[in-house]
Amino acid sequence: MELLERATPLPLAAAHPGVTVLALHGRMWRATRADGAVLGYVELLDTAEGERFLSKRLRPRAQGFLPVGEFWTADEAIESLRA
């Protein structure tokens, strides 16, 4: 069995009012609204250009995720989930 990395806070440079971010494991976070509704997820990726943050939503009634976009900062990834 593969061990998951220890959960760490998402490296946000700014506050995101109305959004709560919960670390799921070392490279994945869940973003929720104040009412508990899940906005989506942010995953840290290693790419040839450096680290990127992938924002994605869980697909309703289907398995897997729908990518929203890849971003250079965690703040951009969180903001993309507000739309």
Show which residues each predicted segment covers.
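Negatively charged, low-complexity tracts enriched in Asp/Glu with abundant Ser/Thr
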Residues: 1-34, 63-68
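Intrinsically disordered, low-complexity sequence elements enriched in Ser/Thr/Gly/Pro
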Residues: 4, 28-31, 50, 55, ...
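A broad, structure-centric signal for solvent-exposed, well-ordered loop/edge residues
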Residues: 8, 28, 38, 49, ...
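Small-side-chain structural scaffolding
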Residues: 31, 40, 55, 69, ...
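Short aromatic-glycine-(Arg/Gly/Cys) micro-motifs in beta-strand/loop hairpins
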Residues: 39-64
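A short, charged, amphipathic alpha-helix used as a generic interaction element across diverse proteins
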Residues: 60-63, 69-83
